[in-house]
């Protein structure tokens, strides 16, 4: 996959040349192209912004440099998606990262200053926001989104399961992790993780994911589609967290049918 970023500050993207993204580029699993759209400004002083019509605070990005920069992109050999990073856009979530991971090229337009000339919006296929807060520019948001998408690509993490088990990948928060030593300052690793019993370990992890999501992110828990095997785990959680009982109707249909007597 190719990530193309239109930005006024390409030097801010040093982190994409470290860690997992660095290895992914070395293995030619991803490509990162940084384009300073100031280079496409036609004025003598390379101005990319101007005062807003009608007055007001701040400066507004001019349309000409970004239109020129996008038109100068080489043809994409596959499917290209152009994303305008904007606080007015759809809030970025894991499902969006999964959707984007199926494209061949993502082009991020990073804003700065007070905002964009409205005509710039016509360049994008979609507008996306990192969250309901305001950043100085789109660069940090672009890096976060690139990381979230890249780790879903085959071979980037090394193990497909690593991405599949991450928080939010299945609508649930991730289960707790432990490593050596088995006891640290009186805090012990759960016995089940030391048992070597793979089915019990998987059940424990699923139960803890359900627990964490219910306690920490009830908004996510309200959207979870439960599996057939979740019924007993959820009933156990009700005994530990009685307030969960009010949700029981959501998984009652998963109750195992009583075995017929012969």
From Swiss-Prot:
Molecular function terms from GO: tRNA (guanine(37)-N1)-methyltransferase activity
Enzyme Commission number(s) of this protein: 2.1.1.228
Domain of life: Bacteria
GO CC entries: cytosol
Record carries keyword Ion transport: no
Enzyme class: transferase
A Gene Ontology biological process term: tRNA N1-guanine methylation
Subcellular location: Cytoplasm
UniProt keyword tRNA processing present: yes
Major subcellular location class: cytoplasm
Reactions accelerated catalytically: guanosine(37) in tRNA + S-adenosyl-L-methionine = N(1)-methylguanosine(37) in tRNA + S-adenosyl-L-homocysteine + H(+)
Keywords attached to this entry: Cytoplasm, Methyltransferase, S-adenosyl-L-methionine, Transferase, tRNA processing
Binding annotation for S-adenosyl-L-methionine: 111, 130-135
InterPro entries registered for this protein in UniProt: Alpha/beta_knot_MTases (IPR029028), tRNA_m1G_MeTrfase_C_sf (IPR023148), tRNA_m1G_MeTrfase_TrmD (IPR002649), tRNA_m1G_MTases_N (IPR029026), tRNA_MeTrfase_TRMD/TRM10 (IPR016009)
NCBIfam families listed in its UniProt record: PRK00026.1, trmD
Family of the protein in this entry: Belongs to the RNA methyltransferase TrmD family.
Assembly, per entry: Homodimer.
Task of the protein: Specifically methylates guanosine-37 in various tRNAs.
Name this polypeptide is given: tRNA (guanine-N(1)-)-methyltransferase
Gene this chain is encoded by: trmD
